[in-house]
Amino acid sequence: MTLKWTSVLLLIHLSCYFSSGSCGKVLVWAAEYSHWMNMKTILKELVQRGHEVTVLASSASILFDPNDASTLKFEVYPTSLTKTEFENIIMQQVKRWSDIRKDSFWLYFSQEQEILWELYDIFRNFCKDVVSNKKVMKKLQESRFDIVFADAVFPCGELLAALLNIRFVYSLRFTPGYTIERHSGGLIFPPSYIPIVMSKLSDQMTFMERVKNMIYVLYFDFWFQMSDMKKWDQFYSEVLGRPTTLFETMGKADIWLMRNSWSFQFPHPFLPNVDFVGGFHCKPAKPLPKEMEEFVQSSGENGVVVFSLGSVISNMTAERANVIATALAKIPQKVLWRFDGNKPDALGLNTRLYKWIPQNDLLGHPKTRAFITHGGANGIYEAIYHGIPMVGIPLFFDQPDNIAHMKAKGAAVRLDFNTMSSTDLLNALKTVINDPLYKENIMKLSRIQHDQPVKPLDRAVFWIEFVMPHKGAKHLRVAAHDLTWFQYHSLDVIGFLLACVATVIFIITKFCLFCFWKFARKGKKGKRD
């Protein structure tokens, strides 16, 4: 071992003794795509603070290579799917998702449920592969981890925590209908003023919108399921050797790190073991690559527009690409378009195509005037952080809801990807660039995001570090988790009080009838006399 690495290891060990906390061993149940990108930001910060982080991932994991040099440790377990097969399945499901007609409530959510069930069948198989692998489980037991860190959208982290008898912390953006947040996290979302996620409503609802919101709540409560819950409940019961459910196991999480922020989310109640850490991945812009910087500078006073539909959508039809290219060619700004496909015929001289762009650095550039986005949460937080108004072209899942939030806050214009014309896109860009109100509104949100007593990333890491030495955070866990559904809604108390009232009414009624009978009998007797 070189002197350099010996010094590094010595410094890490010393930091364990002289820092405010102690170094811990963190086991991570790996997520995919943007979920993994968010987790990785927190994990890197944990490593910098001297903690040992081990990522448990399947051999089919998409976004990272365990063989790459990294400060993270990887424990890879074999699974039946290959990386290519898993990626192809994800891409097929994303395409199905994007193609669902959004004008029909029942059709949209029934097909969305079908897609989610197929994906969660794969996730359950991944979970089975790891808990049934005696070699891997023995190694995990012997490693004596202090905590499990997982994304609640990808179940199994909580099962591993139960098997290893350690505490766990969740990272979560949201689940459809706030299902997991309500049933496992105990969070409260009054439908009278909190729009259910994926409803595309704001918190300023009319009467009919509140009716619509209530219908959404009932639908997600009694009909929609993210996965086949019976299979998950049976699987968890078999593994743990006692009757249990997925929601019950997830409900034992010590801390919920919600990737939300009051600059983005509508105000609503939340619990002591929940913290909003949305935007923790945002950071000041770094210098752009030389060629890209020269192109940006060539825009002069007009500035540039950044355009990205995310990493999952890798291609689009030639017709849609040309509709977009035609609109972009007519604006005075230069355009940097993340696009992985054939060059559109209508592409203007002011537009350059890139397979990848440093999105955060571009949004933080002083010449950036607008951001055309699909509405992914990470991109929206970066736009808020840097104060860039948006044109939203949502595609699927939470994206329409995210753009609805930004539109309600006056920071974005929304378009429909499948029906928008070149004129629609052109007018939307002119609106967010030339109307100063959009810039003012996004700057208000940016100041809110920046003006926090503790940075979101520091808070996220703090709670993970807090749970390890304290062996949990039971003092923050509300007693609602220990109640049955009828106790939670006080139905037993209401029933008891109604029974008491009914008993009193019954006794009073009987007493009155008895008195009436007595007086009537006395009256008849007096008449006979």
Curated annotation (Swiss-Prot):
Reactions catalysed, as given in the entry: glucuronate acceptor + UDP-alpha-D-glucuronate = acceptor beta-D-glucuronoside + UDP + H(+)
Ranges in a coiled coil: none
Tissues showing expression: Widely expressed.
Membrane-spanning residues: 493-513
InterPro entries: UDP-glycosyltransferase (IPR050271), UDP_glucos_trans (IPR002213), UDP_glycos_trans_CS (IPR035595)
Record-level GO cellular component terms: endoplasmic reticulum membrane
GO biological process assignments: estrogen metabolic process; xenobiotic metabolic process
Entry keyword set: Endoplasmic reticulum, Glycoprotein, Glycosyltransferase, Membrane, Microsome, Signal, Transferase, Transmembrane, Transmembrane helix
Function: UDPGT is of major importance in the conjugation and subsequent elimination of potentially toxic xenobiotics and endogenous compounds.
Glycan attachment positions: N315
Signal peptide feature range: 1-21
Pfam families: UDPGT
Protein name: UDP-glucuronosyltransferase 2B11
Family (UniProt): Belongs to the UDP-glycosyltransferase family.
Membrane topology, from the record: Single-pass membrane protein
GO MF term set: glucuronosyltransferase activity
